[in-house]
Amino acid sequence: MKLTRIFWEDFMKNIFAGVSLAALLVAAIPALAQEKGGLDLTGPYDVVVGWFKPGIEGWDQRVVSVNAEDPNRVFIGAVDRNDTREGHPLLAANGALLKGKTAVVRDNNNFTKGDVNNILVLNADGKVIENWSQWNDEVSIAHHIIIDPYDPAHAVWVVDRFNHRILKFSNDGKQLLLKVGEKGVPGNDEGHFHDPASLTFLPDGSFYVADGYTNSRVVKFDKNGKYLLSWGSKGTGPSQFSLVHSVAADANRIYVADRNNDRIQIFDHNGKFLDQWPGTARVTRVITTEDKKVWVSATRYGRFAGYDLNGKLLYQWGTLGDDPGVTDNAHQFDVDNAGNVYVADANNNRVQKFVPKKGADKAHLIGRELVVKK
C-alpha cells in the first residue's frame, strides 16, 4: 500500500508539473511566432502598398500591361470597362481597396467598346499624369506596351489584341506613326494577326510578334513593318504552340512563352528550334536580362522565376492572392532603371510596385531587360 501511495503521489506531481510546463510553452508560442514566423511572399522586394492611384472611384478595369520608361513615367494598359470580370477587387480613386467586388457590365456574347482609360501614364507616386484618350478609337486593348530600346526617339509600341494590330506612337502620344495589321480584321497571313499578344525588338529595329491567342505562330517584321518570316503551328511538339503569349530576345536566340503548353521554347533568330524548358506553369511574360538570366511570370502559382541561359531554375518568389504583394494573373512586368519592379496584376485590377529590400541579394533581383549591343 505504501509503495502504491508513493507511486501515485509522484505520478500526480509529474502530471501537474507537466501541465504547468505545457501552459508555459503554450503561452510562449505567440511570442515565438511573432519573432520567427511568417512567409517571405515578396522575395527580395518590399511592396509599395496602394501605389496605383487610378483617380477614378470604383476602378474596375483589368491592368494587363506595364512598361517603365523611368520611375516617373510608367505606362500601363487597361482593358475596357465593358470587359470587366465579375468578383474581383474594386479600387478607390486613391488606390485603397473598397469593400465591394466588380460586376459584369456587358453581355459576354456582345462586346461593345464603351469606356476609356486604355493607355495611362503614371508618375513615381502611382498617380495618373497622362491619359491617351485621344487614341480611344484606335486602341481596343493595349495588351502589351513596349518602348523600343534601340530607337533614339523612344517610340511607344502597342500590341492591340482585339483589333489585331501593332501600333507605333511618338513618345509624347501625339502621333500615330505606323500600323501593322488591319483594324478589326483577323487573319493568318503576312498582313494580318489574330489576337496578337506581345512583341520584342532586335538592334536593327526588326521585331518579333507573339501571334498569339488564336494563331499559333511567331512573326518577324523589319523596322518598317514589312513581313520577313514566321514559324509555328497549333500543337504540343517542337515549334508548335498553344497560346504564344510573350517573346524575348538576346544576341542569338528568341525565347517564346508557350503559355498553355507550360513551357518556354527557344529558337535562333530565323526560327530554328533549339531547346525547350518544360514545367513553367502558364508563363505570361518572359524577358532576358542584362545579367544573363531569363525571368518569367508563372501565373498558375503567382510566381516570378529566374533561370540561367541553360534553363536551370535559380530563384523564385511570389504566390496567388489579392493582398498587397501577391498577384492574380501577373500578366506583364517590367523593371525601371532604379531596379523597381512593376507588375500588371490583371485580375486584381491594379499595377503593383516592388522596391528592392535593403541589403537584398542582387542575384535574386530581376534585372533590367537586355538591350542587345549593336
Outline where the language-model segments fall.
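Sec/Tat signal peptide C-region and signal peptidase I cleavage site
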Residues: 11, 29-33
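Eukaryotic scaffold repeat domains enriched in small/polar residues
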Residues: 34-374
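Bacterial N-terminal signal peptides
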Residues: 18-28
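Bacterial N-terminal signal peptides that target proteins for export
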Residues: 3-20
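Short intrinsically disordered, low-complexity coil segments enriched in acidic
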Residues: 1-3, 27, 58
